């Protein structure tokens, strides 16, 4: 990116392909106003400065998903006459983002169990990158693993999130840290336990996450 481009501005061509819920009726109130989406994109492009077209595309996709009744979006940002030193008409980037369905289990068997769980649920609901669809009843379960400890309070929630799996994991771990969780004994007691049970239909096996 040349300095002059940030000062004088650049030309972009933006397209957005959106997946919306099936229309059960002809009610405009439940549809997506494509004119409003176009103006929303135009406002981002005109009034914000980005050094990378990748960042611009991310901001557009995230904004559409958060502000309109859209489940998935593919955003393409094209920069005509990009100064890349080659005879190209343009340079472009295309990204696909969506609300990912996931199931999170929660539990506690130390201290104020109900309060730890309640605070975690409220923090998850307050995160703009997460929508909480359903929260189960909380049940009492016996501890597993042979370590003598108090009974657990357990439950599960269905969410939709803009996070990738590892990003969701890191957010949940930050809530565990806020609850002063200490990882010393395997299968040991804990103030707060938040686990990703399912993430879409993905099978994940990395150094830090197994789903």
Language model features with spans:
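Short, surface-exposed acidic-centric catalytic microdomains
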Residues: 23-35, 119, 123-164
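Residue-level signal for inorganic ion chemistry
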Residues: 16, 60, 109, 135, ...
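N-terminal, polar/charged subdomain of small-to-medium soluble alpha/beta proteins
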Residues: 1-102
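Short, solvent-exposed loop/turn elements at beta->coil junctions and helix N-caps
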Residues: 2, 78-82, 138-145, 185-186
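A short coil-to-beta-strand element that immediately follows conserved catalytic motifs
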Residues: 72-75, 131-136, 189
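Flexible, gly/pro- and Lys/Arg-enriched active-site loops
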Residues: 24-26, 101, 144-151, 166-211
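Extended accessory regions or peripheral subdomains of proteins
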Residues: 102-121, 129-130
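Short beta-strand-to-loop capping motifs
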Residues: 18-20, 108, 158-163, 198-201
């Amino acid at each position: 990116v040349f300095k002059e481009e940030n000062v004088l501005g650049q030309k972009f061509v933006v397209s957005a392909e959106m997946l919306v819920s099936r229309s059960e009726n002809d009610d405009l109130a439940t549809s997506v106003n494509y004119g409003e989406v176009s103006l929303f994109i135009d406002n981002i492009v005109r009034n914000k400065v980005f050094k990378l077209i990748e960042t611009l595309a991310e901001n557009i996709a995230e904004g559409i998903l958060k502000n309109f009744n859209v489940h998935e979006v593919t955003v393409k940002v094209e920069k005509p006459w990009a100064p890349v030193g080659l005879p190209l008409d343009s340079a472009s980037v295309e990204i696909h983002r969506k609300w990912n369905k996931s199931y999170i289990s929660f539990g506690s068997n130390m201290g104020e169990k109900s309060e730890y769980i309640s605070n975690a649920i409220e923090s998850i609901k307050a995160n703009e990158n997460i929508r909480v669809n359903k929260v189960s009843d909380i049940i009492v379960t016996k501890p597993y693993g042979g370590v003598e400890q108090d009974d657990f309070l357990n439950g599960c929630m269905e969410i939709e999130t803009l996070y990738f799996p590892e990003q969701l994991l890191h957010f949940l771990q930050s809530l565990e840290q806020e609850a002063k969780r200490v990882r010393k004994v395997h299968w040991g007691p804990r103030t707060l336990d938040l686990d990703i049970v399912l993430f879409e239909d993905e099978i994940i096996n990395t150094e830090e996450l197994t789903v």
